[in-house]
Amino acid sequence: MFKSGFVTIVGRPNVGKSTLLNYIMGEKLSIVSNKPQTTRNNIQTILTGDDYQMIFVDTPGIHKPKHKLGEYMVNSAKESTKDVDLVLFLTNPDEEIGKGDKFILETLRDKKCPVFLVLNKVDESTQDRVAKSLEMYSKEFKFAEIVPISAIKGKNVDVLVELMKKAMPEGPKYYPDDMITDVQEKFVVSEIIREKALRTLRDEVPHGIAVDIIQMKQNEIGTYHIEVDLICEKDSHKGIIIGKNGQTLKRIGENSRYELERFLRSKVNLKIWVKVRKEWRDNQLLLKELGYKANSKK
């Protein structure tokens, strides 16, 4: 009997959703950074075995939106929980149950599919804190399974995957065996560059950063030539991104090139320009150009 289904991963920003997905897949398909709200698009990732296929939807964190981009991210996350076969609610034992957690759980209240509580980052917590967190969440919601894990170290992730397989309904193989994602190569490239920018800049520049790929082509010997605009919202941010004598931008480029060559398995020539687009996160036309398309309301 072949089993297949759709799995969505939800939780507050920065609880480790993308890290978990990347560990399961063994591929860097979803942007990972220490800043919240780094995932901006739903990414369908396909895990296929001999007798199963699970299609994961990696979502932005659900939060109170502050701008048009924030509204897109929240609507995208909510939309992803519709018509799925399993929901993984990811949280952190060292944080109290907040309004954000309760808001997410309330949106899951009427789901007919199973909801797993996945307690991440247990390696950074204490046994008492983990036990207290499990008790608190058990009172808030009736979970089909409760699994403590460490996504970054892979602890108990194999147990989680086995439980997920069991939860999948009987179904067809939706995608070919060798297909691991439904996103275009350019999207992954832009996400890698954005991650490196966020990591390099740390808290110096907020989330008003986007990557627009101007050109991406491969020559006859296999080398990729990639030109991108790194978009920010303020002139002051542009100066920070470039850095003294261009050193910060150079570091972003070097880190991006290394990761891109691993992903593309080829040599990469990368050129990055920094452009200011004031209040781009509230510009619906520019958001569409950058690939952020709002989900249709059902």
Curated annotation (Swiss-Prot):
Q: Which GO cellular component term is one of those annotated?
A: cytosol
Kinase among keywords? no
The processes (GO biological process) annotated in the record are:
ribosomal small subunit assembly
Q: Where is this region: G4?
A: 120-123
Q: Where is this region: G3?
A: 58-61
Between which residues do disulfide bridges form? none
Q: Which CDD domains match?
A: Era, KH-II_Era
Q: Where is this region: G2?
A: 37-41
Its localization reads: Cytoplasm; Cell membrane
> Per UniProt, which keywords does this protein have?
Cell membrane, Cytoplasm, GTP-binding, Membrane, Nucleotide-binding, Ribosome biogenesis, RNA-binding, rRNA-binding
Q: Which residues form the KH type-2 domain?
A: 201-278
Report how it sits in the membrane.
Peripheral membrane protein
Region of interest (G1), residue spans: 11-18
> Can you tell me which residues bind GTP?
11-18, 58-62, 120-123
Say which domain of life the source belongs to.
Answer: Bacteria
Q: What is this protein called?
A: GTPase Era
Task: Look up and give the organism this protein is from.
Answer: Clostridium beijerinckii (strain ATCC 51743 / NCIMB 8052)
Source species taxonomy: Bacteria, Bacillati, Bacillota, Clostridia, Eubacteriales
